[in-house]
């Protein structure tokens, strides 16, 4: 009987989200095998609707916990004309599908694993020739389920826990009553042991989950601390480089200053003797002299121009302060400006003549 | 050998005129600065400025051949007198005269808007008296009146007439074109128009003159 489309759609969505998980909750399967894993599971559920794909935490024998895909449910076991359902869990280990999955018979509370069984260990682990001869990529889950069903039909692995029979009457044959006590004792001990083991496993699993959470938090803290330290190291390195560069710059400046000091020292030594020859009554106005008459005239005109400018500026201040009447102010501004023009125009003319003279001398020099 | 600025009488006359032009421009610059700094009265400024402008126009006319461009002249002799050049060359009248002309222009346009407002008030009130109470008849009149009131800058933003007209326009815009004002609404609108008109006349400056 094919499963209803709604269920298949739901299983599709579940598998898609599970297999595309990223980060810490990602499933540990090789990326290139995920599509095959999906196909195997979908084919299995199509043929055996009593099985459901799930994700759960699997604890390896060495203590590692890992989240894996599993197919959980029952497999039909036809036996003596009646079809029974054997509860199983098919774990897809990290190495699946290159290596076979791990199959456990998962008895309910009122079921007991047959001891001994040719295919099922006391802990429920199933061993089959099909599993031992697993070949990638031809081996698959549908064939596995078929082999499980056939093997279980030949030799059922589970039976119900029966209530203790009524007290045997003495009249019943002694052969029948003799084996009862050891079976009863074995059954009870087995159940208790299994329950104890289950409880211990659950406790250990819970503890491991808590420890894992604590370790993850601790690890994240250490990782952030590491990134802080790395950033600080970078800052210190940059600061150190800057200081080295600054030191080099300062050393260069020091060299320049030392050189300049030497130059000035030399100049002082050369000119120290000349100071004695200077006249005491040095005339400042004669210290500098114009090279020719045009330059002298230029100097005069410029000086007069600027002098008038200063006078006008002073008059501006006087007028602003109110110590100079407006009509006087404006009349004097006009008179001084008129005089200033003559000086400015003369300077302009001298400049033109000097320029012409320069051009002529350059031309003469080139010609000669 | 020193350089002489001029070599003959004609050349000397030219430089004398140049000096006078230079002095006028400089003096005008100082005058503008004094007026701006409020160091002289407007009348004092106007008198002196008129004199300088007349001197400048007379002199520049006679120097037209030698000084075709005043800006070039100012640049040649390194004068920083932009205010004077504007006053003498571009404006041609004292600042007081220039600004008074601008104020007059503003006043004349204001007068025309006032006349427009009065006309719109009277038209609106007369239309209501003639029993023109349909929305498509009343709305354009109130719209024109509101627009002209808004154009008048002497009225305050919260002027009674502006607010009332805005309210009525809003009310009319919610009615259909063929809808008519009730007798009560028509009387209320006429009352609002009349009181707004009275407030408007009271707000006009020198209404009594």
From Swiss-Prot, chain A:
Keywords: Coiled coil, Endosome, Protein transport, Transport. One of its GO terms (cellular component) is ESCRT I complex. It is found in: Endosome; Prevacuolar compartment. GO terms for biological process: protein modification process; protein transport. Pfam families: UEV, Vps23_core. Residues 292-360 form the SB domain. Residues 234-255 form a coiled coil. InterPro entries: ESCRT-I_UEV_domain, ESCRT_assembly_dom, SB_dom, UBQ-conjugating_enzyme/RWD, UEV_N. Residues 155-184 are annotated as: Disordered. The keyword Heme does not apply. Component of the ESCRT-I complex (endosomal sorting complex required for transport I), a regulator of vesicular trafficking process. Required for the sorting of endocytic ubiquitinated cargos into multivesicular bodies (MVBs). Belongs to the ubiquitin-conjugating enzyme family. UEV subfamily. Component of the endosomal sorting required for transport complex I (ESCRT-I), composed of ELC, VPS28 and VPS37. Interacts with FREE1. Interacts with TOL9/TOM1D. This is Protein ELC-like. It comes from Arabidopsis thaliana. The gene is ELCL.
Curated annotation (Swiss-Prot), chain B:
Residues 1-99 form the VPS28 N-terminal domain. GO terms for biological process: endosome transport via multivesicular body sorting pathway; protein transport. GO terms for cellular component: cytosol; ESCRT I complex; Golgi apparatus; trans-Golgi network. It comes from Arabidopsis thaliana. This is Vacuolar protein sorting-associated protein 28 homolog 1. The gene is VPS28-1. InterPro entries: ESCRT_assembly_dom, Vps28, VPS28_C, VPS28_C_sf, VPS28_N, VPS28_N_sf. It is found in: Endosome. Keywords: Endosome, Protein transport, Transport.
């Amino acid at each position: 009987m094919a499963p209803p489309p709604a269920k298949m759609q739901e299983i599709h969505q579940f598998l898609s989200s599970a297999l595309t998980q990223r980060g810490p909750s990602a499933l540990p399967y090789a990326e290139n095998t995920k599509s095959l894993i999906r196909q195997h599971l979908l084919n299995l559920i199509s043929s055996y609707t009593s099985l459901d794909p799930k994700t759960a935490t699997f604890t390896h024998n060495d203590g590692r916990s890992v989240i894996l895909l599993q197919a959980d449910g029952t497999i039909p076991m036809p036996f003596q004309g009646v079809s029974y359902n054997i509860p199983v869990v098919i774990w897809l280990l990290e190495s699946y599908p290159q290596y076979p999955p791990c199959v456990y018979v998962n008895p309910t509370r009122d079921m007991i694993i047959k001891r001994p069984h040719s295919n099922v260990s006391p802990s429920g682990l199933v061993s089959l020739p099909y599993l031992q001869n697993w070949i990638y990529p031809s081996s698959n889950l549908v064939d596995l389920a078929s082999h499980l069903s056939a093997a279980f039909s030949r030799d059922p692995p589970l039976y119900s826990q029966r209530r203790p029979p009524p007290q045997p009457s003495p009249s019943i044959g002694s052969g029948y009553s003799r084996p009862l006590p050891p079976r009863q004792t074995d059954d009870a001990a087995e159940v208790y042991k299994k329950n104890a083991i289950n409880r211990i496993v659950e406790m250990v699993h819970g503890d491991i989950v808590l420890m894992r959470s604590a370790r993850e938090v601790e690890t994240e803290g250490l990782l952030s601390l590491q990134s802080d330290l790395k950033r600080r190291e970078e800052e210190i390195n940059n600061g150190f480089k800057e200081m080295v560069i600054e030191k080099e710059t300062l050393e260069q400046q020091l060299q320049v200053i030392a050189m300049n000091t030497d130059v000035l020292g030399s100049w002082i030594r050369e000119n120290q003797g000349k100071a004695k020859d200077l006249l005491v009554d040095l005339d400042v106005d004669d210290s500098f002299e114009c090279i020719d008459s045009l330059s002298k005239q230029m100097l005069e005109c410029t000086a007069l121009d600027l002098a008038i400018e200063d006078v006008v500026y002073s008059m501006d201040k006087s007028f602003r302060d109110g110590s100079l009447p407006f009509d006087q102010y404006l009349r004097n501004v006009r008179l001084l400006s008129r005089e200033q023009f003559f000086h400015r125009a003369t300077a302009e003319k001298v400049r033109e003549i000097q320029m012409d003279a320069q051009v002529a001398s350059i031309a003469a020099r080139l010609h000669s | 050998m020193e350089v002489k600025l001029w070599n003959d009488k004609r050349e000397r006359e030219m430089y004398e005129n140049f000096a006078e032009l230079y002095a006028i421009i400089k003096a005008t610059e100082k005058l503008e600065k004094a007026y701006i700094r409020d160091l002289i009265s407007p009348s004092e400024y106007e008198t002196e400025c008129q004199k300088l402008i007349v001197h400048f126009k007379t002199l520049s006319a006679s120097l037209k051949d030698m000084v075709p461009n005043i800006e070039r002249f100012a640049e040649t002799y390194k004068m920083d007198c932009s205010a004077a050049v504007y006053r003498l060359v571009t404006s041609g009248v004292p600042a007081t005269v220039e600004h008074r002309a601008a104020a007059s222009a503003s006043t004349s346009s204001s007068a025309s808007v006032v006349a427009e407002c009065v006309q719109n008030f009277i038209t609106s009130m007369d239309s209501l008296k003639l029993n023109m109470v349909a929305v498509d008849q009343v709305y354009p009149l109130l719209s024109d009146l509101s627009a002209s009131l808004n154009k008048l800058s002497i009225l305050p933003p919260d002027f009674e007439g502006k607010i009332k007209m805005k309210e009525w326009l809003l009310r009319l815009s919610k009615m259909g074109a063929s809808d008519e004002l009730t007798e009560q609404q028509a009387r209320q609108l006429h009352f609002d128009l009349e009181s707004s008109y009275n407030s408007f006349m009271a707000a006009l400056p020198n209404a009594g003159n």
